[in-house]
Amino acid sequence: MITGALLGASFPAQARADDTIKHPGDHPHYSVEIEPHLLLGWAANYYYGGGTGFGVGARASINLTHDGFVSSINNSVAIGLGLDWLHYDAPACFYYYNRGAGCYGGVSADFFQFPVVMQWNFYVAKHWSVFGEPGLYIWHGSYGNGACYNAAGVLVNCSYSDTGVGPAFWIGGRYHFNDTIALTVRLGYPDILTVGVSFMP
């Protein structure tokens, strides 16, 4: 209830007065959405201790149907595929610590992420749409060399890489400038925030 009230208060009055959501199919009909973006991330796998990362990425969302799961409202469904790169600056190399070696030090890390999601879109007003994206992501992390010491105070090699798979979920919204270009913002896991521009030819 509180969340709904906050969202309602923050949503533009013009959008709240619009009844676009009540008209199934009344939205831009495109085959694919291409969305380059900037992103803010966190260390999502337990081998890396923490901190905030910055990077760039892109999504390609392939439309499956312009009439979504609920036939009485204006919604659509797509499959989203992505590639993101994130860089983290030198916090402690906790992946050694988590593996029982007691390693502390300062190294940087680079992550590549490959999200695969179902994108469920809701067209709530003439210029506004929102979406949810459940799915999974494949990640690969590469950790640079650094001055790391184990629990005994002995210098050890902090260079390391690993690959894994994890659950993913995002919520987001778009402001549609027209039928082919929109500003897109996304919040969720594993990325905290993405901001990009969607092209829908």
Located regions from the model:
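Bacterial N-terminal signal peptides
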Residues: 1-10
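Residues that define the transmembrane beta-barrel architecture of outer-membrane proteins
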Residues: 30-32, 50-56, 75, 108-114, ...
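Short loop/turn motifs that connect adjacent beta-strands in outer-membrane beta-barrel proteins
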Residues: 16-31, 65-77, 123-130, 177-180
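Residues on the lipid-exposed face of transmembrane beta-strands in outer-membrane beta-barrel proteins
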Residues: 36-40, 56-62, 83, 114-120, ...
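Sequence/structural signature of outer-membrane beta-barrel proteins
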Residues: 39-47, 65-67, 84-92, 138-145, ...
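Flexible, solvent-exposed loop segments that connect beta-strands
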Residues: 47, 85-109, 140-163
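Short glycine/proline- and aromatic-enriched beta-strand/turn motifs that initiate or cap beta-hairpins
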Residues: 14-66, 188-190, 194, 198-201
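Predominantly the C-terminal beta-signal and adjacent terminal strand-loop region
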Residues: 19-20, 27-30, 82-85, 155-201
